[in-house]
């Protein structure tokens, strides 16, 4: 291959890009609907729930970190965090050695809400989970999505994947199942 030549065709690139776009859009529609139904009784929207979850797993974070790991604009992270603060779920602070960044921490009230939501999670009401159940039943495990994780690592960086993995490890290590509900150990 000559310098500057690509080892893929434009047609191949288009088909791949369109496949990812269509699959992502279809998957997101299901994820969004399921997520909204799950958190609706608690008067939260997806961004607010995501911010609470990130703040919980990071044990405090800057607004920039919330934006990065929540895949949202900094102003979106700030505005929704402000609403959560007004409801008593988060507190804002500045660090002595870093006055430029605003930090948030989940409050006891915010943690209680998040834990209650985790207890209320019902896999039967999750269409993506139910869609993957046949694969688990056949192969004995859920898809691990390693190719998707690799793509996201190349787009967002290793830090993004590390935080994502840490949140899942936190659930694995710090929660147990009791009466078909997820509860903190």
UniProtKB/Swiss-Prot annotation:
Record note on quaternary structure: Homodimer.
GO molecular function terms noted in the UniProt entry: DNA binding; DNA-binding transcription factor activity
Protein keywords: DNA-binding, Repressor, Sporulation, Transcription, Transcription regulation
Superkingdom of origin: Bacteria
DNA-binding residue intervals: 63-86
Gene: hpr
Annotated GO biological process: negative regulation of DNA-templated transcription; regulation of DNA-templated transcription; response to stress; sporulation resulting in formation of a cellular spore
Boundaries of every HTH marR-type domain copy: 13-157
Function field: Negative regulator of protease production and sporulation.
Name of protein: HTH-type transcriptional regulator Hpr
Database matches in NCBIfam families: PRK13777.1 (NF010349)
Keyword Chloroplast recorded: no
Phosphoprotein found in the keyword field: no
Pfam families according to UniProt: MarR
């Amino acid at each position: 291959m000559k310098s500057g030549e690509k080892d893929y065709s434009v047609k191949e690139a288009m088909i791949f890009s369109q496949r990812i776009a269509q699959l992502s859009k279809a998957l997101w529609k299901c994820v969004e609907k399921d997520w909204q139904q799950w958190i609706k009784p608690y008067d939260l929207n997806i961004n607010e729930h995501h911010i609470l979850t990130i703040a919980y797993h990071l044990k405090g974070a800057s607004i920039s970190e919330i934006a990065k790991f929540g895949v949202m604009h900094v102003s979106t992270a700030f505005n929704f965090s402000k609403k959560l603060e007004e409801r008593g779920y988060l507190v804002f602070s500045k660090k002595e050695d870093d006055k430029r960044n605003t930090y948030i921490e989940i409050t006891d009230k915010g943690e209680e809400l998040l834990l209650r939501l985790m207890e209320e999670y019902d896999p039967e009401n999750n269409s993506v989970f139910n869609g993957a159940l046949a694969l688990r039943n056949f192969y004995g495990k859920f898809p691990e999505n390693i190719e998707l994780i690799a793509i996201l690592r190349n787009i967002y960086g290793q830090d993004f994947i590390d935080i994502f993995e840490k949140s899942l490890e936190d659930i694995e290590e710090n929660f147990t199942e009791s009466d078909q509900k997820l509860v903190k150990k």
